[in-house]
Amino acid sequence: MINMTRKLYYEDAYLKEAKGRVLEIRDNAILLDQTIFYPTGGGQPHDRGTINGVEVLDVYKDEEGNVWHVVKEPEKFKVGDEVELKIDWDYRYKLMRIHTGLHLLEHVLNEVLGEGNWQLVGSGMSVEKGRYDIAYPENLNKYKEQIISLFNKYVDEGGEVKIWWEGDRRYTQIRDFEVIPCGGTHVKDIKEIGHIKKLKRSSIGRGKQRLEMWLE
């Protein structure tokens, strides 16, 4: 099967509602011609919401890049139906802020620790917080206040988040900072991220540390 899903969440990450047409149904998963639902990937959880008022339980991408929506009541759909899509915008927007916030944190760590002096070994996010797992020899608590202060300063200044494609690779860049390959959804300006409310450092063994970030 070729890729048949138009990914509206890449064209406009701020779309909250859209229409789509059912192309195929497999068990409890439906394939649409276009979608605003972001599928799980790149450390970012899938969107929540409804299709024709039916709850969406999971969203995933297959090997061809088609986006499948696992729904609570698949029997309410048939191939050819035109359907109404609505995402849980509060949930998505929190994830957008956290995802862009992690990219900004990466730049701040490069400034504070020195680019090339630390290594990102893992990451993740939920609607509550973002996480980076880092290989670095010194205890990051030493730099915590500096990291928070610089992060919040950049947020106050603001700056455009640029997104573009090169072939099938998607790239993001905050201001004139690092270019980061990324398939996630992001805010348009880093002012939208908000300040860091809490930054927690913990050891995860063998010279690796975890930074967890909560936003205001």
Curated annotation (Swiss-Prot):
What GO molecular function annotations does the UniProt record carry, in alphabetical order?
Answer: alanine-tRNA ligase activity; aminoacyl-tRNA deacylase activity; ATP binding; metal ion binding; nucleic acid binding
Q: Which UniProt keywords apply?
A: Cytoplasm, Metal-binding, Zinc
**List of residues binding Zn(2+):** 99, 103, 182
Highest taxon above the source species: Archaea
Swiss-Prot/TrEMBL GO biological process terms: alanyl-tRNA aminoacylation
Q: Which Pfam families match?
A: tRNA-synt_2c, tRNA_SAD
Q: What does this protein do?
A: Functions in trans to edit the amino acid moiety from mischarged charged Gly-tRNA(Ala) and Ser-tRNA(Ala).
Tell me what this protein is called.
Alanyl-tRNA editing protein AlaX-M
Give the organism, scientific name.
Answer: Pyrococcus horikoshii (strain ATCC 700860 / DSM 12428 / JCM 9974 / NBRC 100139 / OT-3)
